[in-house]
Amino acid sequence: MGGEVSNKTWVFKQSPSGLPEPGVHTAFEDRPLSLVAPPGGLVINLLTAGLDPHQRDRMRGAGNVDYVPGYEVNEPITNFSIAKVIRSDNAAFEEGSLIAGSLPIAEYGIIPKELIDARAMASPLVWKVSNDYNLDVKHYVGTLGLAGMTAWNSFYGLVKPVKGETIWVNAASSSVGEVVVQLAKIEGMKVIASVSSDDKLDYVVNELGADVGFNYRKEPVGKALKRLAPDGLDVVFENVGGDHFQAAIENMKWFGRIISCGTASQYNKPVEEQYGVTNLSEIFRRRIKIQGFIFWDDNIYTDNIENFKATMPKWVSEGKIKSRYTQFEGIEQADKAFLSMFTGGSHGKTVLKISDP
């Protein structure tokens, strides 16, 4: 069964120097699509797209070689999403099944066999979702998707939690941060959480269970950490960068560890305007271990992903792991949804609902 459908698509147009401007750096285009599956491939209907701050980093352009490819001009913007298979020429993916992975943010998409077979280090780029607990599909782009895998693999693979240790999680109400806070409490750690508003502070302390927290817009980061962790920090789960990273270094215990997940405060700044950390010599003085990562890295993915798949859906269904979502409706809201992550307009995981399951 063939035919062609109109297909509104979110397209990357040019690299911004600051916040991307809708209609200049991104655009919506109708890119009609054939409903015939390619050999060994799929046709999908996108259900919910996840949006993440690191996408701004990918807007540097395709000519920049980095941990993930930059977006190509005049090509669809991609990110971790969940979709329904509507045409299949691949026995592993029957029509009507759900798939998740790195998908184009468009109403419909073609998934070639090459993408199905591809891997990013230890992880496939596309995989089948079973949804055994009949959860809202948005969880599979958040707590059970990229955010959850990022938090789980790095927490158990790099943080290596020790009961009684003190961990500071910044951007603690973000999609990754909120999971790390809860995993740390499950493992008996003392959690200090920092956020950008009083509403988020209430959430991370009174709903997620952080021991203490602070609003960095009201209290300088370094001052707050000295107040809340006078004996220093064992672990920092770093999502923000900039002054937060500097404060992390100056408040670490000897042999402490900083796990660097991202630098969200710096993504929209030109290189010459990015924060200059001035206390790097404290790294050797305090014997600090700093480790960056991507969730699919061989050293953390292979040993942890099966436990994630077996445990997290159950915990989400039981309410043991909580999460918040800021959901936007319709592909036309993609720019607004994306910008909300940098302007304080989102809470938890930002998702874009495009179609019903």
Swiss-Prot record:
Domain of life: Eukaryota
SMART domains from the UniProt entry: PKS_ER
Stretches with biased composition (Polar residues): 1-17
Source species taxonomy: Eukaryota, Fungi, Dikarya, Ascomycota, Pezizomycotina
Enzyme class: oxidoreductase
Phenotype of null mutants: Impairs the production of fusaric acid.
Keyword Coiled coil set for record: no
Disulfide-bonded cysteines: none
Pathway annotation: Mycotoxin biosynthesis
Applied biotechnology uses: Fusaric acid is phytotoxic to plants such as cotton and banana. It has been shown to induce programmed cell death in plants. In addition to a mild toxicity to animals, fusaric acid exhibits acanthamoebicidal, antioomycete, and antimycobacterial activities.
Function: Dehydrogenase; part of the gene cluster that mediates the biosynthesis of fusaric acid, a mycotoxin with low to moderate toxicity to animals and humans, but with high phytotoxic properties. L-aspartate is suggested as fusaric acid amino acid precursor that is activated and further processed to O-acetyl-L-homoserine by cluster enzymes aspartate kinase FUB3 and homoserine O-acetyltransferase FUB5, as well as enzymes of the primary metabolism.
Gene it is expressed from: FUB6
GO molecular function, one term: oxidoreductase activity, acting on the CH-CH group of donors, NAD or NADP as acceptor
Name of the protein in question: Dehydrogenase FUB6
CDD domains, alphabetized: PGDH (cd05288)
Keywords recorded for this protein, A-Z: Oxidoreductase
Family: Belongs to the zinc-containing alcohol dehydrogenase family. Quinone oxidoreductase subfamily.
Region (Disordered): 1-22
